[in-house]
Amino acid sequence: MSEGWNIAVLGATGAVGEALLETLAERQFPVGEIYALARNESAGEQLRFGGKTITVQDAAEFDWTQAQLAFFVAGKEATAAWVEEATNSGCLVIDSSGLFALEPDVPLVVPEVNPFVLTDYRNRNVIAVPDSLTSQLLAALKPLIDQGGLSRISVTSLISASAQGKKAVDALAGQSAKLLNGIPIDEEDFFGRQLAFNMLPLLPDSEGSVREERRIVDEVRKILQDEGLMISASVVQAPVFYGHAQMVNFEALRPLAAEEARDAFVQGEDIVLSEENEFPTQVGDASGTPHLSVGCVRNDYGMPEQVQFWSVADNVRFGGALMAVKIAEKLVQEYLY
């Protein structure tokens, strides 16, 4: 389709929405018309796309027949409100909210891992983007799985405040400023506890487990098509504004030397491998970048089948915007003509 695709971005004024517009332009995605959509209170705002200014429209007044592809990056409530109207109008929705992630007839896609499930995109005209933690984990693991197979995964994720939106980022900034000036913080704020210069575990819900940890396990099993996969996931709230970090223990089906694992990472898509005597950080290597950084690669002591590594990625640009755009690229290159 040489003239480009007409695209709507629901949640265009949010962090992921703005990063998605930037990513579409940077990767020269074939765009015909672009429609920036948000709630009524954001209508009329001006955004930049590809060197041009675009005006945000009220999603409630948008004619979905104008768009062929839509990126939904505004959360579950917005997805639930507009997905039926969009899909019934013939628009194909790439949804990042998690609302459809575990629906059996909706493809859940990490482009590097299971692009073949995109053949099912017409089941409901919806494709689900995994949580940014799942995308980060599987994008890093794909080269190792290809090299040595997969027996078991253990991952500890240190998540940034931006995972919970702008209010969380502002709350962390406010706490930090107060404490640096000797002012006590209000523990009734967004986090309910001091996060600045601190770490917070996540509490289990009524199901007896942590929602974010449960989502990683369920999504990884669905994407790898292995409901019995042994995977342990822990999530900790870190005092970082942007960028998630993961410490991963991967068990292969055969002995896999650390040097072999490093060679596999070098071949991985959108992976930057640190030198052996260096390591990546959220602040220095993740924030604002569209790639995954990996370091500290070594074998677990006395366990030649187990490889441990550290990864960092920008949850907004890599886990949010880039994953969605790469799904769209696969679609237009291989399935939509």
From Swiss-Prot:
A GO BP entry: amino acid biosynthetic process
CDD domains assigned: ASADH_C_USG1_like (cd18129), ASADH_USG1_N (cd17894)
Cellular compartments per GO CC: cytosol
Xref: InterPro entries: NAD(P)-bd_dom_sf (IPR036291), Semialdehyde_DH_NAD-bd (IPR000534), Semialdhyde_DH_dimer_dom (IPR012280)
A molecular function (GO) term: NAD binding
Highest taxon of the lineage: Bacteria
NCBIfam families: PRK05671.1, PRK08040.1, PRK14874.1
Family, per entry: Belongs to the aspartate-semialdehyde dehydrogenase family.
Protein name per its UniProtKB record: USG-1 protein
Source organism: Escherichia coli (strain K12)
Organism taxonomic ancestry: Bacteria, Pseudomonadati, Pseudomonadota, Gammaproteobacteria, Enterobacterales
